């Protein structure tokens, strides 16, 4: 169902005039430097002895996932990695470092162009899930000849397509293609299952180990939804982004995390007050939901190690899984938020951006706690406000009525309602927060998101909010720097929340379009500001210190 990498709009580094053969050590180092190295340390002292021993096995299993994913990206990846490792020259070392950052010889930030000679100029659209010369037309013609079962296998998450002398093509299960690695990974999961004290973790690890060998992930996806343990692990084939041909095939990834109990308690507190917030939303009372449904679970964790599809390029900051529609229908989905990753992004990207865009007097009010609390409130806000609505006498949904505009409007709504919620809880005396920190951090964070550009839902939604705040006098631009007008920002937040909620509640596609056409624009003052932050690192490059200390890596 997706992941949030806080991907941001950046200038493409590699132009068509520079070939992989011509890239120098300095150029490769500059490309790598777009990712700021940062140590990730996690406190494991509160884990039981059994869980601590299990954690070591899970770190080792995570590294096996990397080996599988390299094979999924390109058939020549393992041989190329070995060749690069043997090249001890400065150029060879620079290529190897950037290879591991991208998990292959194509640069994620540069339209998947090659930075190593002797490989396809661009990453194959079908990765290694299909024959490299397969066309869409060939695949579509073949699947028309298949039975319902055969079609399910061909288009399924967990098979690769190979040529077959008799039938033209065939679907081969992951359990067969990556069998050696999956047997190794399953054994490590079973060892961890025996060591842990937690029943839900043990069940997930046992069922996921079986899934690696059977190629049937349903039972273990259900067990993952039920996982409630100090060690929070996600491991297996999930996202389909690397299948650019059809979006069918899932890449293996792993996130080994430690649950953050303090932030989890904060989420429960928010959840306990969601109905009260709903009852006071700034919109016509007839549109409020007198009984909001159960909210999808959200876990706040700290990442020990990630690998495979979750570890290349821009780092994942949150993910929402599983993708199996049967499981989603039965159990819903779960959102996992990686707090220490988000803190690292805040420190290495948002903080330096802020120093370039905020007025000096505003800088002391920049706060990670405000940043992360607003992110939590944003996620909770997706669960309140209009969802099922009635338009012209018929039952429908906000998504169906707003169509292509839904994502941008909903992202803007969640941002603004997150602010409204925190202010509401503060006014009721439920929480204490520093208003100046909240709104100053929101202003600074706007520029982090606006680096997405305006072709993506988060960027469109943020541009809408930003223009609205400027028009209301809540954000002020003086002498090339920005500040918050505290006397106006609260009212602006409430007014914008009202407008967005009303558009959603009435299914007003025309109204949504007018808002986006009018407000979701790249203002000249914003464009000028973004030019000044172009040199700030795009993202982070985690160094998994705790993982290495617990389970030293042998390469």
What is each model feature region?
Residues 5-17:
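Bacterial N-terminal signal peptides
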Residues 497, 501-555:
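Extended, compositionally biased alpha-helical segments that mediate assembly or anchoring
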Residues 60-67, 97-104, 188-191, 207, ...:
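Short, hydrophobic/amphipathic alpha-helical patches that form generic packing surfaces
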């Amino acid at each position: 169902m997706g992941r949030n990498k806080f991907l941001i709009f950046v200038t493409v580094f590699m132009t068509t005039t520079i070939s992989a053969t011509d890239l120098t050590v300095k150029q490769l180092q500059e490309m790598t430097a777009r990712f700021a190295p940062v140590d990730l340390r996690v406190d494991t002292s509160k884990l039981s002895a059994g869980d601590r021993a299990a954690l070591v096995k899970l770190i080792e299993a995570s590294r096996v996932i990397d080996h599988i994913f390299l094979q999924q990206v390109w058939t020549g990846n393992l041989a190329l990695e070995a060749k690069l490792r043997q090249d001890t020259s400065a150029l060879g070392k620079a290529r190897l470092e950037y290879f591991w950052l991208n998990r292959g010889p194509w640069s994620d930030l540069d339209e998947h162009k090659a930075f190593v000679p002797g490989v396809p100029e661009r990453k194959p659209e079908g990765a290694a899930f299909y024959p490299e010369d397969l066309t869409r037309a060939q695949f579509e013609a073949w699947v028309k000849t298949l039975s319902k079962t055969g079609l399910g296998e061909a288009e399924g998450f967990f098979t690769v397509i190979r040529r077959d002398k008799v039938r033209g093509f065939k679907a081969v299960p992951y359990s067969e293609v990556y069998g050696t690695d999956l047997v190794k990974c399953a054994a490590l999961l079973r060892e961890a299952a025996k060591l842990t004290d937690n029943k839900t973790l043990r069940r997930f690890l046992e069922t996921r180990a079986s899934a690696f060998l059977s190629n049937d992930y349903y039972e273990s996806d259900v067990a993952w939804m039920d996982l409630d343990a100090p060690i929070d692990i996600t491991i297996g084939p999930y996202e389909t982004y690397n299948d650019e041909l059809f979006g069918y095939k899932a890449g293996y990834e792993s996130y080994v995390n430690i649950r953050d109990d303090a932030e989890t308690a904060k989420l429960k507190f928010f959840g306990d007050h969601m109905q009260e917030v709903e009852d006071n939303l700034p919109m016509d009372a007839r549109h409020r939901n007198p009984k909001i449904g159960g909210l999808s679970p959200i876990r706040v964790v700290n990442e020990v190690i990630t690998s495979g599809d979750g570890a290349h390029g821009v780092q994942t900051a949150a993910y929402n899984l599983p993708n199996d529609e049967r499981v989603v229908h039965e159990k819903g989905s779960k959102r996992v938020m990686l707090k220490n990753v988000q803190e690292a992004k805040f420190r290495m990207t948002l903080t330096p951006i802020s120093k370039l865009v905020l007025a000096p007097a505003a800088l002391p009010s920049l706060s990670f706690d405000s940043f992360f609390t607003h992110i939590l409130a944003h996620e909770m806000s997706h669960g309140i406000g209009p969802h099922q609505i009635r338009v012209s006498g018929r039952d429908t949904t906000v998504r169906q009525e707003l169509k292509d505009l839904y994502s941008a409007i909903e992202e803007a709504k969640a941002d603004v309602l997150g602010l409204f919620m925190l202010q509401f809880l503060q006014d009721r005396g439920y929480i204490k927060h520093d208003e100046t920190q909240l709104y100053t951090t929101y202003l600074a964070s706007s520029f982090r998101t606006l680096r997405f550009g305006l072709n993506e839902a988060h960027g469109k939604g943020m541009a809408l909010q930003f223009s609205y705040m400027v028009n209301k006098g809540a954000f002020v631009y003086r002498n090339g720097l920005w500040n918050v007008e505290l006397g106006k920002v609260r009212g602006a937040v409430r007014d914008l929340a009202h407008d967005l909620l009303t558009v959603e509640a009435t299914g007003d596609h025309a109204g949504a379009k007018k808002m986006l056409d009018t407000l979701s624009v790249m203002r000249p003052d914003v464009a000028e500001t973004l030019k000044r932050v172009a040199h700030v690192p795009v993202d982070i490059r985690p160094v998994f210190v705790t993982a290495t200390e617990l389970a030293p890596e042998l390469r």
